[in-house]
Swiss-Prot record:
Family recorded in the similarity comment: Belongs to the type I cytokine receptor family. Type 2 subfamily.
Region (Disordered): 626-648
Residue positions of motif WSXWS motif: 222-226
Designated name of the protein: Interleukin-12 receptor subunit beta-1
Disease named in the record: Immunodeficiency 30: A form of Mendelian susceptibility to mycobacterial disease, a rare condition caused by impairment of interferon-gamma mediated immunity. It is characterized by predisposition to illness caused by moderately virulent mycobacterial species, such as Bacillus Calmette-Guerin (BCG) vaccine, environmental non-tuberculous mycobacteria, and by the more virulent Mycobacterium tuberculosis.
Keyword Acyltransferase: no
Compositional bias annotation for Basic and acidic residues: 626-637
Lineage: Eukaryota, Metazoa, Chordata, Craniata, Vertebrata
Organism: Homo sapiens (Human)
Localization (cell): Membrane
Transmembrane portions of the chain: 546-570
Signal peptide region: 1-23
Gene this chain is encoded by: IL12RB1
Amino acid sequence: MEPLVTWVVPLLFLFLLSRQGAACRTSECCFQDPPYPDADSGSASGPRDLRCYRISSDRYECSWQYEGPTAGVSHFLRCCLSSGRCCYFAAGSATRLQFSDQAGVSVLYTVTLWVESWARNQTEKSPEVTLQLYNSVKYEPPLGDIKVSKLAGQLRMEWETPDNQVGAEVQFRHRTPSSPWKLGDCGPQDDDTESCLCPLEMNVAQEFQLRRRQLGSQGSSWSKWSSPVCVPPENPPQPQVRFSVEQLGQDGRRRLTLKEQPTQLELPEGCQGLAPGTEVTYRLQLHMLSCPCKAKATRTLHLGKMPYLSGAAYNVAVISSNQFGPGLNQTWHIPADTHTEPVALNISVGTNGTTMYWPARAQSMTYCIEWQPVGQDGGLATCSLTAPQDPDPAGMATYSWSRESGAMGQEKCYYITIFASAHPEKLTLWSTVLSTYHFGGNASAAGTPHHVSVKNHSLDSVSVDWAPSLLSTCPGVLKEYVVRCRDEDSKQVSEHPVQPTETQVTLSGLRAGVAYTVQVRADTAWLRGVWSQPQRFSIEVQVSDWLIFFASLGSFLSILLVGVLGYLGLNRAARHLCPPLPTPCASSAIEFPGGKETWQWINPVDFQEEASLQEALVVEMSWDKGERTEPLEKTELPEGAPELALDTELSLEDGDRCKAKM
């Protein structure tokens, strides 16, 4: 048994050695058939982007990318020499392989390289690369800081050339948040500093990557892509923010608050997160419109730092900027705080000028006194800056001016604001001391009420009206009206205060028939006004209405009685002076009995018995319609009366006709 073992073991060892010699070494390119079917499956996935280059004097490297699932994938680097012989390197699951110039691959002559991947029982091939390995140097992408600037509406990128790699061909690719990669060419580079001109977008951010390869070697491999270069849009996005201002505090300051944050810029995938170069900086620029005589009117702050402001008027601008410069601004106007304190400011007007007194804030305070006519544009405001001053013993600060200066010399209403600051050079340290109204010029004379009128109100009162004083147009200046009434007989004077909003008062307790004079003046808190022109009036003595009624009634009854008596007297006189005449038809004297007989007489001698008697004819008249008549009056014919000729025939029908007429 031992002799058999002695012979078998050496033979087995020799057999293994012979088999190892026949097998391909891992460090060499194997010139045998590959251990897989050599046929491209045409799959869309597989190895891509093969690059082969020299990394040292005798060392070379090939690398590639694989797209698709990597589990169970084996990679083989294939190489065909110019003679037509082909070999392969087994790389396993790695995508990078190194070999020396002794691996059986010609490095001084042109060779063709590609990658075959065996996966899922199929073969996937990469595109072929033909090159001379010794001259194919591995170029690095742009390293370090890539400077980005704007040149003639284009984007210019500049970087330092990697060491020992002068002379390169450079490409770039770029994309936006909503677009895929786009390839561009930078052209040949042959200097220690390389640059590239790229398109610049106006309103969207871009991501750029650069790669390099040896100039003049078309078969050489490209370097890997550089790190992302994030470029902001040419125009920074305009901020859409909103501010609010709090109420003015006791310290004369109010807080400016940002209500809405600016919108964030949309970035491509490779620039999301901390992407230097795409930052948009928002700054807050304050412009204090009030107190134009101060040394500094503007200040720029970071948007995140909200300042405290005085009660002055401001323009607040939000400035957006990126590495290309500032963009469009958005400006808001913050109006001045109009809260007034009419009792906080004392004004003394004298022959030498005017002096203001107000409560001092602190030691060494600089005050800015600003005034402007009410109703005018704020740009017409005038101001005066005082030197730093300490409070007087009464704790007051003062400011004086002469009449020659013309300050507030016109007779009109002025709005006065006083600001204070211990550091006037710092715009955000101003505070409002007070705001009030003041009537300039000769307020006593200018405020005198005009058009004073007096109207009767009752038997012992009158209503006094007047036009509003000019002081009433100045809020808080007019304290009250005073109406003075003077009794011209007793020389007694009474004064009546009236609210500044009223222009009418009723004076009562007056006596009829007495002369009075009335005057009106307008007073301020620090000055008495001038009396208006006196208006004279009196209340007439009034007669009782009942007395007038009874007097009128007596007159009426007297006239009525006289009329009745006169009428009766005239009636009686008319009966005596003008008695009524008889009515023939109403008298029975003309009625004759016996039918239609005619009586004629011409001369009394025809009736001797009548003529001798010489009796008077008596005619009786009856007022009744019946046969009975009563004599009312008797008329006697005197002697010597003319003869009565009765040549009329009266019949019964004629008598009836007369009765009918009656």
